[in-house]
Amino acid sequence: MSEHPLQVFRFCPKCGSQDFEIHNALSRHCAQCGFTFYQNPRASTAAFILNTKGELLVATRGKEPEKGTLDLPGGFVDNEETAEEGMVREIKEETGLVIDPEKIEYQFSIPNVYRYSGMDIHTLDLFFVCHVDEDAKVTAADDAANLQWIPLNEVYVERFGLRSIRQAVHRFLAQNC
């Protein structure tokens, strides 16, 4: 069973007081020092990488959650990164592909809850599309256990493990097939 981080955090991160009460659904407030902690969603990215043969690059998840299911290359945006920079970094980390940030196109976003270390991490998943040559060399690394190119008409939504990825793949296929 997972919990929202605001249910787990019991002490003020500024002064250490136990007088750290729920302020509203998104925050806790410390009665001792006046600090208010807001739990905002984390930015996350995922890529629809298409080659010139019209195939989608799909990863097999190498780690929990949903280890062994299909996924899109992507991950969390780091501090001080733009969404595009985070997307380019994640693509390189998981596939070895080097993509020009100017060549990725934003598609849409989906709010999500990502369960990790027993907590519900609220995310805003940003989806991008980019195109590569059909002979682009890919190597599975980081969170990706395996990579495969799949023709769009052979992509099955139910094989993707994460809810927001399934929703995004369904939406992308509806717009592009």
Where are these regions (language model features)?
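Short cysteine-rich clusters marking metal-coordination/redox-active sites
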Residues: 12-15, 30-33
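NUDIX/MutT-family hydrolases
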Residues: 138-169
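Short metal-coordination and nucleic-acid-contact micro-motifs, chiefly zinc-binding Cys/His arrays
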Residues: 5-11, 26, 43
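Short functional micro-motifs and their immediate structural scaffolds
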Residues: 20-21, 38
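Short linker/helix segments within small regulatory modules
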Residues: 21-27
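Conserved N-terminal beta-strand and adjoining loop/helix that marks the start
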Residues: 32-56, 76
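Active-site-adjacent beta-strand/loop module that shapes the phosphate/pyrophosphate-binding cleft
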Residues: 108-137
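Conserved Nudix-box catalytic region and its N-terminal flanking loop in Nudix hydrolases
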Residues: 2, 51-93
